[in-house]
């Protein structure tokens, strides 16, 4: 753990040389509701249950010093796992549930607006585009790939505030909606992805490197 933190600090310091302000978060997350609907006559749908995983997010903000609103971009990636999934047809739940192994991984990139309030609080709004891969292995094997629209709403409280370095906690909600994609079933059938959503709630720790310091914020 100490080595991981040392690598993160070194990476943040290096990135700060290129950007005015850099943030990194390490989060755990759960997905209380995920839906994956394939474009077929009976609208086959997969709903993974109890998925839990981890994610990293990097935020790069431009301009100096820090202001009430900072504009930048975010890059996020994550991985989660689940053991159970429900299957639906025409909106009706099928009797058999999957108890095999499933996973979901994603990568998202998009613009971001960060709202700084006082010394300790900041809010993040970040729409973006991403790619998502869902895989399920059971009596039926499914691999689904989608391009998604993503909206991330986050809150961070900074409990350590030093000039050029800040540490705090991170919590938020993230919504992903597929725009296009396909699903392969048992290596025999390929369907277009019709609709769906992934709702994610996350929490973790946050690091900030650069000029988001209380003294510079007040000076602005």
Could you describe each region identified by the protein language model?
Residues 1-4:
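Positively charged n-region of N-terminal signal peptides that target proteins for export
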Residues 11-18:
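Hydrophobic h-region of N-terminal signal peptides that target proteins for export
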Residues 19-70, 84-87, 181-185, 200-220:
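Short glycine/proline- and aromatic-enriched beta-strand/turn motifs that initiate or cap beta-hairpins
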Residues 28, 81, 86-99, 176-196:
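Primarily recognizes Gram-negative and organellar outer-membrane beta-barrels
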Residues 29-35, 74-82, 128-134, 170-178, ...:
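Outer-membrane beta-barrel pore domains and translocons
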Residues 52-149, 157-163:
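Gram-negative (and chloroplast) outer-membrane scaffold detector with strong preference
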Residues 146-148, 166-176, 191-197:
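Extracytosolic secretory-pathway proteins
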């Amino acid at each position: 753990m100490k080595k991981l933190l040392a690598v993160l600090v070194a990476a943040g310091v290096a990135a700060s040389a290129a950007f005015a302000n850099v943030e990194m978060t390490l989060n755990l997350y759960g997905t209380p509701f995920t839906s994956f609907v394939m474009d077929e006559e009976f609208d086959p749908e997969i709903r993974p249950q109890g998925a839990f995983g981890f994610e990293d997010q990097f935020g790069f903000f431009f301009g100096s010093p820090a202001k009430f609103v900072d504009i930048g971009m975010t890059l996020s990636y994550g991985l989660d796992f689940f053991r159970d999934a429900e299957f639906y047809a025409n909106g009706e739940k099928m009797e058999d549930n999957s108890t095999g192994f499933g996973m979901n991984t994603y990568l998202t990139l998009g613009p971001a607006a960060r709202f700084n309030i006082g010394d300790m609080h900041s809010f993040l709004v970040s729409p973006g585009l991403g790619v998502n891969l869902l895989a399920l292995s059971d009596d039926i094997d499914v691999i689904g790939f989608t391009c998604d629209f993503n909206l991330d709403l986050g809150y961070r409280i900074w409990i350590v505030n030093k000039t050029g370095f800040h540490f705090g906690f991170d919590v938020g909600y993230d919504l992903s909606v597929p725009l296009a994609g396909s699903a392969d079933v048992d290596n025999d059938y390929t369907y277009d992805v019709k609709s769906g959503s992934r709702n994610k709630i996350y929490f973790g720790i946050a690091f900030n490197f650069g000029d988001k310091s209380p003294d510079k914020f007040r000076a602005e």
